[in-house]
């Protein structure tokens, strides 16, 4: 196994260990750490990327778990999944709000459309099924980010700032219900995190 390290930051999501398993299945070493781990300790591991997990909270609530904002200045690529995606948006100047049935609340298998010019979706189909489970959505994405995936109900299923290496997806690529999810994770590891065999 490749001993370059990916750190999965745990924000309380139910699929955290599954994310780690998918990373390892792609041949990259991975450790799951609580979001409260001091940034200096995380950076001492010399990660080639961070993956922020999902979680049951809303980023705009006062007691919601957050990451040290200095992480975004560390020069390390970040992939946010569900809550992790919203966390990226929230910290970098976007706006996350509660969804309702008319504004992008999604649960279950969802037909999703991708911009395959984004490194995260390189070599993948422009349309596939993903597994959604979110009650919040990004009403406004941060400056410098592009919208790179959407569904019929949600205009911003995925965002990216390729210059800084920040990527976020509202869906769960780690679960089997998401077609090509493991391929997307592999792209993060090898195309963005620059892991090598």
Report residues per predicted region.
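C-terminal and late-domain segments of enzyme folds
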Residues: 146-150, 154-167, 175-191
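Conserved small/polar residues in nucleotide/adenosyl-binding loops
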Residues: 195-197
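Short, charged N-terminal beta->alpha structural module
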Residues: 5-26
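A short, well-structured beta->alpha microelement
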Residues: 27-43
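Catalytic beta-strand/loop cores that center a nucleophilic Ser/Cys/Thr
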Residues: 116-163
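Generic structural signal for residues in well-ordered beta-strands
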Residues: 30-32, 96, 147
């Amino acid at each position: 196994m490749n001993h370059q390290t990916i750190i999965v930051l745990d924000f309380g999501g139910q699929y955290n260990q599954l994310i780690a398993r998918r990373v390892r299945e792609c041949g990259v070493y991975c450790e799951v750490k609580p979001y409260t781990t001091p940034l200096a300790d995380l950076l001492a591991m010399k990660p080639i990327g961070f993956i922020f997990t999902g979680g049951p909270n809303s980023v705009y609530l006062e007691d919601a778990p957050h990451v040290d904002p200095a992480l975004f200045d560390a020069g390390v690529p970040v992939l946010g999944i569900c809550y992790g995606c919203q966390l990226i948006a929230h910290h970098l100047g976007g706006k996350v709000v509660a969804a309702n049935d008319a504004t992008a609340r999604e649960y279950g298998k969802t037909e999703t459309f991708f911009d395959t010019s984004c490194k995260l979706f390189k070599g993948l189909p422009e349309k596939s099924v993903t597994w959604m489970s979110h009650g919040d959505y990004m009403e406004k994405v941060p400056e410098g980010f592009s919208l790179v995936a959407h569904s019929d109900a949600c205009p911003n299923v995925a965002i990216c700032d390729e210059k800084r290496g920040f990527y976020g997806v509202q869906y769960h690529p780690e679960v089997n219900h998401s077609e090509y999810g493991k391929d997307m994770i592999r792209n993060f590891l090898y195309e963005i995190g620059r892991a090598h065999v």
